[in-house]
Amino acid sequence: MEDAWEADALEAAEAAAAAAQAVAADAPTTTPSPRTLQRQRACEALMEGDAPDAAPDAPLRCAIAWDGVNCWPETPAGALAVQPCFDELNGIRYDIRQNATRMCYSNGTWRNYSDYVHCRELVEAESDEDAAMAFVFFVGFCLSLVAIAVAIWIFLYFKDLRCLRNTIHTNLMATYICNDATWIISAVVQEYVENGGLCSVLAVLMHYFYLTNFFWMFVEGLYLFLLVVATFTGEKVKLQIYIIIGWGIPGVIVVTWAIIKHLGKTAPDNAGESHPMVLLIKHCPWMAEDYFDWIHQAPVITVLAVNLVFLFSIMWVLITKLQSANTAETQQYRKATKALLVLFPLLGITYILMMQGPMDGVAGHVFRNAQALLLSLQGFTVALFYCFLNTEVQNTLRHRMSRWRETRTVGGGRRYTLSGHSKDWSPRSRTESIRCLQHRS
């Protein structure tokens, strides 16, 4: 009975310690930190001075031992050795208030591994600035969600607004909804729930929707480039091609990244601190940055670089056209500046401006807060410029309100539906997305 109990206890202890023992197993394959080497040298000095007791009636004991992570003291046979957790390992700080254990068998030998299951990484307290930035991101994403949801409803409800250009806008706005919503869900869930499986799913979804956002920005840039710069219209490129670019390619990239990251089993590095989009995510190794992340980071950088080329090309055509027009120079500059500012959020140029900046002092504080504000309100800005301030949208809404008031004045003699209407009054400028480009010949 006692043997059965001992076997069950041993099996349970081995199962509980299996995951934690990976720390000790990895130690020989990584370069030990100076603190770990210091502990090892101190332990080796103790082992050299630990002379074995040659007395025949001396009780069995386990000698001082170094397991690659911690130093275990001399322990009587059949006893469980208890040691405070190491304070540091491979540059990561651990909670020394918790304990690690190692069994000394009745024959005076150590168990092959130690139990570090209770040794947890110390989580630094969130600074006031980090909390403020997280709040800005949260509020900005919520505002963007509301604005984009209204904009998408307008584009889908009113048939007069259904065209390839607005369909592209709608898909871009949909990526903002998915991206912002996933970030909010991740922030809330990871704040209160520690679940490795859920963390992995949220990480993959966040990276996918983050990528789709940039690829639909690329689609916007490609469409405008074909419309304004190229010799043929962007309407000749079918919507299906844009959908494959915007939704399909990011899926292939993220699946590839997820498989390689899972197989690589890399350790967390900086806990994703450099990525503003995961500011609130905690205890989630999948959010940690490593060299595998270049699989999805390189396409983002490429998209932004290509969109920058698109922007220069479009602005060159616009400025050339304005210079040939009979308008005052001040008015030309005003129109060019307006077009440039409108294109910034659509093509993701804001991300380029916020990619690098000062990190220390007052300048760093201002930059980080500006980064949080601009990036979280990116979706709101797109909805504002390309829906709420769009001439075509305003005319559509104004026309519907006018018709609705007329029917109420008449007394509602016939039922009028907002979606049943004529399309002959609505402007159909191919370059309505940039109103100052309307008169391109």
UniProtKB/Swiss-Prot annotation:
Membrane topology type: Multi-pass membrane protein
Record keywords: Cell membrane, G-protein coupled receptor, Glycoprotein, Membrane, Receptor, Signal, Transducer, Transmembrane, Transmembrane helix
Biological process annotations from GO: adenylate cyclase-modulating G protein-coupled receptor signaling pathway; cell surface receptor signaling pathway
A GO MF label: G protein-coupled peptide receptor activity
Topological domains annotated Extracellular: 188-194, 261-291, 358-371
A Pfam family per the record: HRM
UniProt cross-references to SUPFAM superfamilies, sorted A to Z: Family A G protein-coupled receptor-like, Hormone receptor domain
Chain's role: Receptor for the insect diurectic hormone. The activity of this receptor is mediated by G proteins which activate adenylyl cyclase.
Family recorded in the similarity comment: Belongs to the G-protein coupled receptor 2 family.
Protein name: Diuretic hormone receptor
